[in-house]
């Protein structure tokens, strides 16, 4: 998750904010000096039993003044009211998102990746091992942080600074160029449907069921 903090901080660099302000956003919205580039952490944040990971993230946020908002307390699998408190669906957050960050260093596969494809949002990700082994060759267009990690002094991880800078520049284009954005998200959606939809599932299962594999 800390890699997403670095990504947002790079987007908030004055030069990139100036580009966003000059071009305006992909959907016609203006971007002004008062506009926020916020990282919203909506889903479950994995942690150690000690809770130290979240503490480290919040220290990093506060030190760099990252606009990061933890809202997992009001997000659930579906909309409901719990003890008088409104709980929103994770899908509600996708409606308001302009970009999905998926900086996981390790995943069993990557369901959140599929969610981002379905929501038709551009994706920034770290090339975790399963992505490289099972997903990368399908041809998805993503903003990549590469696949090299290093430990940082604060007990978190980092990637080469140039990868963060390159990712932020690509994100500016996807946030401001409607045509480019549509080409990317529509192409990703079609690739996802071809390989990972329920229709595609039958292609993988039938040979097994028929004993042909």
Language-model features and meaning:
Residues 1-7, 39, 116, 167, ...:
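A structural motif in glycosyltransferase catalytic domains
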Residues 1-26:
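A conserved mid-protein helix/loop that constitutes part of the nucleotide-sugar donor-binding site
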Residues 91, 114-118, 132-133:
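Short alpha-helical segment that forms part of, or immediately flanks, the ligand-binding pocket
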Residues 102, 122-125, 132-136, 142-147:
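Short hydrophobic beta-strand element within catalytic cores of glycosyltransferases
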Residues 105:
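Aromatic "clamp/platform" in nucleotide-sugar-dependent glycosyltransferases that forms part
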Residues 144-180:
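C-terminal "capping" alpha-helix adjacent to the active site of nucleotide-linked donor transferases
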Residues 161-166, 175-209:
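A charged, aromatic-enriched C-terminal amphipathic alpha-helix characteristic of glycosyltransferases
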């Amino acid at each position: 998750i800390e890699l997403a903090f670095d990504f947002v901080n790079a987007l908030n660099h004055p030069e990139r904010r100036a580009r966003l302000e000059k071009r305006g956003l992909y959907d016609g919205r203006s971007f002004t000096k008062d506009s926020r580039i916020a990282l919203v952490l909506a889903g479950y944040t994995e942690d150690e039993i000690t809770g130290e990971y979240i503490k480290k993230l919040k220290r990093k946020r506060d030190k760099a003044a990252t606009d990061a908002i933890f809202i997992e307390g009001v997000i659930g699998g579906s909309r409901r009211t719990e003890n008088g408190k409104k709980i929103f669906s994770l899908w509600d957050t996708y409606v308001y998102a302009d970009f999905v960050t998926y900086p996981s260093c390790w995943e069993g596969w990557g369901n959140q990746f599929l969610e981002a494809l379905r929501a038709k949002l551009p994706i920034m990700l770290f090339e975790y091992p399963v992505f490289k082994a099972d997903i990368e060759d399908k041809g998805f267009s993503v903003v990549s942080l590469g696949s090299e990690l290093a430990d940082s002094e604060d007990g978190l991880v980092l990637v080469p600074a140039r990868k963060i800078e390159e990712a932020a520049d690509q994100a500016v284009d996807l946030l401001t160029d409607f045509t480019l954005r549509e080409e990317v998200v529509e192409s990703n959606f079609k690739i996802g449907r071809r390989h990972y939809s329920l229709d595609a599932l039958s292609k993988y299962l039938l040979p097994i069921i028929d004993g042909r594999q």
